[in-house]
C-alpha cells in the first residue's frame, strides 16, 4: 500500500491543503430559510477554534473505533508500559488551562507548544496508519491548522518551545523501526493522548 506524505508537496500546495480543510469542514453559518445574506453571524476566532477542535475529536473517535474493531486496540492496560517510552504532551495544573488558576497567555503558550510536540507523532500516524487514511490525514492536517490559529492568537509566541531537530530525527527513526504491535500501540496511544489534550484545550478555549 502506498502512503502519501506531506513532505512530497511544495509549501504552497500544503498551505492550500490546510485552507481547503478549513473551508470544507466549517462552512459559513447562515439562516435556515430566507435571504442567506441577511442575519448571518460571523464566527469569532474562539468559535472557529472550538469547531475545529470538535471536528478533530470526531475524527479521532472514528480512528479509535476502527483500531478497536480491526486490531483489538481498545483500552489496554499493557499499553501503559509502551506509553512510558513515549514523550506525549499533556496538560497540567501549572499550565494555566484549568478553570482554577486559569491564565490565558500561559495556557495558549502551553497548548501551542503541546501541539507542536504532537506533530511528529501525527506525521507518523498519517504515514503508517493502515485503516481510513483520509481520517488519519485529516487529524494531522487539521491539527496543523489549529496550531497556526493558536499562534496567531497568542502574544507570547517567543515562549513556545520548538522541538530540537536532532531530537526529532532520532525520535522519527525510533518510530519508523517499530514492529507491527508496537506501531499500532504507538498510534493508539497517540490518539488517546491527543484526545485528552484537545478535550482540555476545548474547555480552555471556551473561557478565553
From Swiss-Prot:
The gene is IL6. GO terms for cellular component: extracellular space; interleukin-6 receptor complex. It holds the Pfam family IL6. Disulfide bonds join 68-74, 97-107. SUPFAM superfamilies: 4-helical cytokines. It is found in: Secreted. Residues 1-27 form the signal peptide. It comes from the Eukaryota. Cytokine with a wide variety of biological functions in immunity, tissue regeneration, and metabolism. Binds to IL6R, then the complex associates to the signaling subunit IL6ST/gp130 to trigger the intracellular IL6-signaling pathway. The interaction with the membrane-bound IL6R and IL6ST stimulates 'classic signaling', whereas the binding of IL6 and soluble IL6R to IL6ST stimulates 'trans-signaling'. Alternatively, 'cluster signaling' occurs when membrane-bound IL6:IL6R complexes on transmitter cells activate IL6ST receptors on neighboring receiver cells. IL6 is a potent inducer of the acute phase response. Rapid production of IL6 contributes to host defense during infection and tissue injury, but excessive IL6 synthesis is involved in disease pathology. In the innate immune response, is synthesized by myeloid cells, such as macrophages and dendritic cells, upon recognition of pathogens through toll-like receptors (TLRs) at the site of infection or tissue injury. In the adaptive immune response, is required for the differentiation of B cells into immunoglobulin-secreting cells. This is Interleukin-6. Belongs to the IL-6 superfamily. GO terms for molecular function: cytokine activity; growth factor activity; interleukin-6 receptor binding. The modification Phosphoserine is found at residue 77. Keywords: Acute phase, Cytokine, Disulfide bond, Growth factor, Phosphoprotein, Secreted, Signal. Component of a hexamer of two molecules each of IL6, IL6R and IL6ST; first binds to IL6R to associate with the signaling subunit IL6ST. Interacts with IL6R (via the N-terminal ectodomain); this interaction may be affected by IL6R-binding with SORL1, hence decreasing IL6 cis signaling. Interacts with SORL1 (via the N-terminal ectodomain); this interaction leads to IL6 internalization and lysosomal degradation. May form a trimeric complex with the soluble SORL1 ectodomain and soluble IL6R receptor; this interaction might stabilize circulating IL6, hence promoting IL6 trans signaling. The keyword Signal applies. It comes from Felis catus. Gene3D superfamilies: 1.20.1250.10.
Amino acid at each position: 500500500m502506498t502512503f502519501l506524505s506531506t513532505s512530497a508537496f511544495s509549501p504552497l500546495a500544503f498551505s492550500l491543503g490546510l485552507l481547503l480543510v478549513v473551508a470544507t469542514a466549517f462552512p459559513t453559518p447562515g439562516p435556515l430559510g430566507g435571504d442567506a445574506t441577511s442575519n448571518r453571524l460571523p464566527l469569532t476566532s474562539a468559535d472557529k477554534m472550538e469547531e475545529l477542535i470538535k471536528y478533530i475529536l470526531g475524527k479521532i473517535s472514528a480512528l479509535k473505533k476502527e483500531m478497536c474493531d480491526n486490531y483489538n486496540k481498545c483500552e489496554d492496560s499493557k499499553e501503559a508500559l509502551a506509553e512510558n517510552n513515549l514523550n506525549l504532551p499533556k496538560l497540567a495544573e501549572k499550565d494555566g488551562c484549568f478553570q482554577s488558576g486559569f491564565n490565558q497567555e500561559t495556557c495558549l503558550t502551553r497548548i501551542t507548544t503541546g501541539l507542536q510536540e504532537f506533530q511528529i507523532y501525527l506525521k507518523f500516524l498519517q504515514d503508517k496508519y493502515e485503516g481510513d487514511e483520509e481520517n488519519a490525514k485529516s487529524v494531522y492536517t487539521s491539527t496543523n491548522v489549529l496550531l497556526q490559529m493558536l499562534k496567531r492568537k497568542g502574544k507570547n509566541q517567543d515562549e513556545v518551545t520548538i522541538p530540537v531537530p536532532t531530537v526529532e530525527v532520532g525520535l522519527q527513526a525510533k518510530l519508523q523501526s517499530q514492529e507491527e504491535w508496537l506501531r499500532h500501540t504507538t498510534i493508539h496511544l497517540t490518539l488517546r493522548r491527543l484526545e485528552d489534550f484537545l478535550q482540555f484545550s476545548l474547555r480552555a478555549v471556551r473561557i478565553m
